[in-house]
């Protein structure tokens, strides 16, 4: 099983690289629905910052021309971590 913090770093890197194939396995069905809602305003970033909030929750701030922060709650599904809930933070 992947370490959760390693998974967060890989996930954020995949977001920046627009690696959709890598991202697809990162979401539970409920998490995917919320990600699709955020997808109407795509991210454009060159770097990211991660804040571990504890309890399998994280805020990832994507930095580009602007900054966007996405909160997510991760859960272990089988042998991998997936996003069960997410929201954009101001």
Provide a role label for each language-model segment.
Residues 36-37, 61-62, 70-72:
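Generic alpha-helical hydrophobic packing signal
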Residues 2-57:
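Short solvent-exposed beta->alpha transition segments
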Residues 1, 20, 64-67, 73-75:
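Intrinsically disordered, low-complexity regions enriched in Ser/Pro/Gly/Gln/His and often acidic
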Residues 57-65:
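Short beta-strand segments that buttress and anchor functional surface loops
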Residues 52, 62, 85-88:
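Surface-exposed beta-strand edges and flanking loops
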Residues 67-90:
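Short beta-strand edge/turn micro-motifs at domain boundaries
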């Amino acid at each position: 099983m992947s370490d959760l913090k390693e998974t967060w770093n890989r996930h954020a890197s995949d977001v920046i690289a627009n690696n959709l194939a890598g991202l697809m396995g990162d979401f539970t069905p409920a998490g995917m629905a919320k990600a699709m809602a955020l997808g109407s305003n795509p991210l454009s970033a060159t770097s990211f910052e991660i804040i571990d909030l504890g309890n399998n929750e994280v805020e990832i701030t994507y930095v580009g021309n602007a900054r966007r922060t996405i909160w997510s709650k991760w859960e272990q599904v089988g042998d991998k971590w997936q996003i069960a809930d997410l929201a954009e933070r101001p």
